Amino acid sequence: MGEAVGIVELFGLVAAFAAADAGCKAANVTLEDFDKNKPANADALPVPLIVAIKFRGSVSDVTAAVDAAVRRANEVSGVITSYIIPRPEADTEKMLKISGMDTSR
């Protein structure tokens, strides 16, 4: 078990970059990953790409980063959900390392 992980799932790559920037500027966190997904109903969505960004750091820093990222993403295109895992278990850590942008799988 290590540092906290915060995940923000949102609409669009531009919003993801804006949210990641805001989160990293708001707190002492590391931006771990961008996961992207084009859902089957993409044509019906306002923005046809869903992106999840992951922050890692202390619980208080991750909370501040996620809050800032959510505010910024809502200004751009919208947030689907966000969640903070204070101390991920070892098995959860394995799943957190899986990335939709990992082409080695």
Q: Predicted regions span which residues?
A:
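Long, contiguous binding/interaction regions
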Residues: M1-I50, R56-R105
